[in-house]
C-alpha cells in the first residue's frame, strides 16, 4: 500500500505540468471566428481584451455589429460606458458597437437579461467573445438558455491566464480556481 502511494505521488510530481495544463485546457473551449449576425462581448474584462477581440471580428468582416454587455458598476457607470470608448481610442469606429446596459451580476443573469434583446433584434447566429478561461462555461450557459440560436465562442486572450502555465502566476491561479468553482456550481445547477 505504501509503495502504491509512493508511486502515485511520484507520478503526480513527474506529470504535474500535464495534469495542471489539462485542467486549465478544459476551461478553454472556443473555435476560430465564423460569420454571424453579431458578436456579443460578455462583461467582466477590465483590460479591454474582449472588446478589442470583438471589434477586430467586425473589422475583419465576420460580424456587422458588436453588442457590448454593460452591467452597472463603479461610480454609476455601466461597463459599456468604459469599453466602447476604449475600443474607439484603439482605432475602431463607434458605429460598430451597440450598448446592452443591464444589471447582471453573473454569466447566467447576463444571459437572461440579454437574450430577449438579442432575439428581438432578429439575431440567429451569435459569436460570444469572452476571456479564454471563461469560454467553456459561458458557451454552455448561452447554449442551454438559447437552444434556438446558433452560439459560437471566440476566446479573447487573458493577460494572466494561459492553459499551460497558469500555475506560475498568482493572478492566473486565482482565475483558475474561481473559474473551476463556477464551473462546478454550474454543473450542479447553482
Question: What is the predicted role of each segment?
Answer:
Residues 1-9:
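N-terminal Sec-pathway targeting helices
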Residues 168-190:
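A transmembrane-helix-recognition feature enriched in membrane-embedded lipid enzymes
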Amino acid at each position: 500500500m505504501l509503495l502504491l502511494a509512493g508511486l502515485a505521488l511520484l507520478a503526480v510530481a513527474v506529470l504535474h505540468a500535464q495534469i495542471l495544463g489539462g485542467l486549465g485546457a478544459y476551461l478553454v473551449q472556443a473555435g476560430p471566428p465564423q460569420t454571424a449576425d453579431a458578436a456579443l462581448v460578455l462583461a467582466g474584462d477590465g483590460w479591454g481584451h474582449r472588446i478589442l477581440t470583438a471589434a477586430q471580428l467586425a473589422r475583419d468582416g465576420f460580424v456587422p455589429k458588436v453588442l457590448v454587455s454593460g452591467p452597472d458598476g463603479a461610480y454609476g457607470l455601466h461597463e459599456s460606458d468604459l469599453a466602447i470608448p476604449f475600443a474607439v481610442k484603439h482605432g475602431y469606429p463607434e458605429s460598430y458597437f451597440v450598448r446592452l446596459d443591464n444589471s447582471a451580476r453573473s454569466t447566467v443573469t447576463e444571459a437572461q437579461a440579454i437574450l430577449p434583446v438579442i432575439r428581438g433584434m432578429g439575431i440567429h447566429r451569435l459569436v460570444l467573445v469572452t476571456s479564454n478561461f471563461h469560454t467553456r462555461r459561458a458557451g454552455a450557459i448561452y447554449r442551454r438558455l438559447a437552444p434556438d440560436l446558433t452560439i459560437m465562442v471566440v476566446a479573447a486572450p487573458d493577460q494572466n491566464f494561459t492553459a499551460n502555465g497558469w500555475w506560475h502566476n498568482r493572478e492566473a491561479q486565482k482565475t483558475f480556481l474561481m473559474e473551476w468553482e463556477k464551473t462546478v456550481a454550474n454543473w450542479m445547477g447553482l
